[in-house]
A protein has these predicted regions:
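Short alpha-helix in the alpha/beta-hydrolase fold that links the catalytic acid
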Residues: 8-30
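Short beta-strand/loop motif that positions the catalytic acidic residue
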Residues: 2-5
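Solvent-exposed loop/turn segments at secondary-structure junctions
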Residues: 7-11, 36-39
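C-terminal catalytic histidine-bearing segment of alpha/beta-hydrolase fold enzymes
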Residues: 27-78
Length: 78
């Protein structure tokens, strides 16, 4: 199991620090996403860091790699 989460997720319900805490508590690897562009709309919707806007392809490739191999090749996606 893995958690993919944006470091700067603006949604008040899904702060990165909480994902990091849960990752540690549950022993699940955390993959931190950074950066992106074109953010717009409500903080908890898909077109902000919450939805990995501007990083969709990199996140999708990392998830594809995870599905194909059962592992992630890095802890951060920039």
């Amino acid at each position: 199991q893995f958690i993919f989460h944006h470091k700067d997720d603006p949604c008040r319900y899904t702060y990165h620090r909480d994902a990091a805490r849960l990752s540690e508590k549950w022993g699940i690897k955390l993959v931190t996403v950074r950066g992106g562009t074109g953010f717009r709309g409500d903080a908890c919707q898909a077109f902000t860091q919450h939805g990995f806007t501007g990083r969709e392809e990199k996140v999708a490739l990392a998830i594809r790699h995870l599905v194909e191999t059962g592992a992630v090749d890095k802890n951060e996606i920039d």
